[in-house]
A protein has these predicted regions:
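A helix-coil-helix interface module used to build multimeric assemblies
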Residues: 2-166
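Single conserved hydrophobic/aromatic residue that forms the stacking wall/gate
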Residues: 165-173
């Protein structure tokens, strides 16, 4: 699959915030946060990492140049190595990724992306439930025809139907 292949589902349906989490730049920013956290932990465990190096990484972590990384990857033929080289070149130090494998990085970052994505979904779901509750309150006395087995049934109110949907169990029972 080409690096420039468009993900139709993401392009059409994902929110800007979700695309920021799962996009190339978002992933790189999370990787850099991960590397900095690991370097700090390694230093606290006695590995010789100068404070200036950590400060340098922190000062350049938001400088993402996808084109430069892509050019490095064309030479290294390894995506993670290219991102390591880019970050080290920006910081002027070579202390990240000590003792790590590519999978250590990518698996942890993927878990962070999943967590951030779920947090975003939770926020949006809560906002939707609040809106539904507001509408249920506003239109609580509106009479409508209930349905059972997709057939019209007795009269009920919009408030009752909305409340039913708001209180459905979410654990699959």
């Amino acid at each position: 699959m080409s690096k420039n292949t468009v993900n139709i589902l993401a392009e059409r349906y994902a929110s800007k915030e979700m695309n920021q989490i799962w996009g190339a730049e978002g992933r790189i920013l999370l990787e850099r946060d991960y590397w900095i956290a690991v370097v700090k932990a390694q230093k606290s465990l006695g590995i010789d990492i100068p404070d200036e190096a950590i400060e340098a990484y922190e000062s350049v972590k938001d400088q993402v140049n996808l084109q430069s990384i892509q050019e490095r990857e064309a030479v290294t033929r390894h995506d993670v190595k290219a991102r390591i080289e880019e970050f080290c070149a920006l910081a002027g130090h070579e202390h990240i990724h000590k003792g790590l494998t590519s999978r250590d990085l990518t698996e942890n970052v993927e878990q962070l992306q999943i967590l951030r994505g779920l947090e975003l979904i939770r926020i949006k779901a809560m906002a939707s439930l609040i809106k539904l509750a507001e509408k249920a309150e506003k239109w609580s006395q509106l009479v409508l025809t209930a349905r059972t087995h997709n057939v019209p049934a007795q009269l009920t109110t919009f408030g009752t139907v909305s409340y039913t949907h708001l209180t459905l169990p979410t654990n699959g029972t």
